[in-house]
Amino acid sequence: MNKILLFAIGLAIFSSCTENKKSIIAFASDNPAERVVWERIRLADPATGQIPNNIRKKEMIFAKTLPKSTVISKANWKHRGPYNVGGRTRALAMDVQDENILFAGGASGGMFRSTDGGLSWAMTTSPNQLHNVTCVAQDTRIGHEDTWYFGSGELTGSSASGGEAYYGGNGIYKSVDGGLSWDSLAVTATNTNGFDSNFDFIWNVKTDPSNDSLDVVYAAVYSAIYRSENGGNSWTKVLGGGSAYYTNVEVTSTGVVYATLSSDGTDKGIWRSLDGQNWTNITDSLFTPVYGRIAIGVNPGDEDEVYFLAAETDGYGQHTDVFFNGETWTSLWKYNANTTAWNDISLNIPANQNSSFDNFNAQ
């Protein structure tokens, strides 16, 4: 009897260990990269190995031809989500004509417009357009306020393609009806699924409010700065062209242009131009030698005072501990255009708070 009991106990222990081992194997860590490859194989044309161009638009057109069921009534259904498909909000703007009209663009969710100060929102990008908005700008000149531009293409990862994977765009979109509808600027769009144009990834777009004779627009794209004099119908590269991953551009009310290119590019640094075509590198000799994206802020009360916030400045600037046991370095500098003087004010960046979630973490 004792032998039978011991055998039963041993069998139970062995079974328990086996089950635990199976559980560990069953819940192995995910691999987002393999998921992307798997999904691409499922979507690609077997003959070419590529995802057909404009296939989503064709799919939507075909769906309209399918027979509709009369059994299920719309009254039987209630929308239960998901509601959080906008992704990271990369673009935000207020209409200069009406402060209650707001625009918000998601890195993987499209462009949304509000007419009541943000109490309610309506998507203004159409289903057959790419929904990866990264920046938005209004033409603030008198008589041109209904003209808007937004750039597409997310290089730092989005919910549509995985946390570390980029989400390619399709150029710049333009609206001439106050943001109610958007049309692609054909010269910036390739309508392909691959990375084959600088305009596939746009960091920022700005208009020149000082020029009444030309419709001047600037675009900070992958590795370069482009300029248009006809509202985006044609473009000229005015700065860069190397391998800078991050770029940015800002324009003052008088038409002075500032641009930045990350340290991995050949034309790296902080640049200034009086006409948008001839540029001077104004980077201070003590500025951090390593930097990624640089945000630009012009003081509206004194446009000769410009701030530059640089991320990923390893070993320089302010060190902060961030969530998930991470750490980061960020540098903040102030430039005076009158005196050409630079001040390192990185110590003003919040750090060493009670929680790592309270520390500053640039994107």
Q: Could you tell me what each predicted segment is?
A:
Residues 4-13:
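Sec-dependent N-terminal signal peptides
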Residues 17-363:
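Extracellular glycan-interacting surfaces
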